[in-house]
């Protein structure tokens, strides 16, 4: 794990939900959970950028969540990872480096 991922996992206020299909939103209670917690932005990480991450990004954007994908905390097929990240950046949300995202979070705490 990168140091950025380690920083995120140190937090005690995160929840884990089990993904059953290509999107974390289907068929789960994730949307209900996020809405009940008042969460409007989702940060997506994981493997299969060109499949599961992008499917979850589409579903999140279609449900009016703001999508952020840390490019260094995802992995995909060799030839499809970068095109998937470009598609997310063009149509679905923000693609950033995890250190920049953590820096933004830290500055919001101050």
Q: Each predicted region: which residue ranges?
A:
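Single conserved hydrophobic/aromatic residue that forms the stacking wall/gate
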Residues: 1-5, 9
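A charged, well-structured terminal subsegment
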Residues: 17, 94-110
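Alpha-helical scaffold elements lining the catalytic groove of polysaccharide deacetylases
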Residues: 18-43
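Residue-level detector of anion-binding/catalytic polar loops
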Residues: 40, 66, 94
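A short glycine-rich beta-strand->turn/loop micro-motif centered on a GG-aromatic cluster
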Residues: 43-47, 66-78
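Short glycine/serine/threonine-rich phosphate/pyrophosphate-binding segments
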Residues: 50-56
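Anion (oxyanion) recognition and catalysis
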Residues: 61-62, 89
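Active-site-proximal loop->helix
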Residues: 76-91
């Amino acid at each position: 794990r990168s140091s950025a991922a380690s920083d995120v996992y140190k937090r005690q206020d995160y929840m884990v939900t089990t993904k059953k299909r290509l999107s974390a939103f289907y068929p789960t209670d994730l949307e209900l959970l996020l809405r009940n917690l008042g969460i409007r932005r989702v940060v997506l990480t994981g493997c299969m950028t060109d499949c599961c991450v992008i499917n979850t990004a589409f579903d999140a954007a279609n449900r009016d969540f703001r999508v952020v994908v840390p490019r260094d905390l995802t992995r995909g097929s060799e030839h499809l990872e970068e095109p998937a990240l470009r598609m997310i950046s063009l149509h679905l949300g923000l693609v950033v480096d995890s250190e920049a995202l953590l820096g933004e979070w830290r500055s919001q705490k101050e």
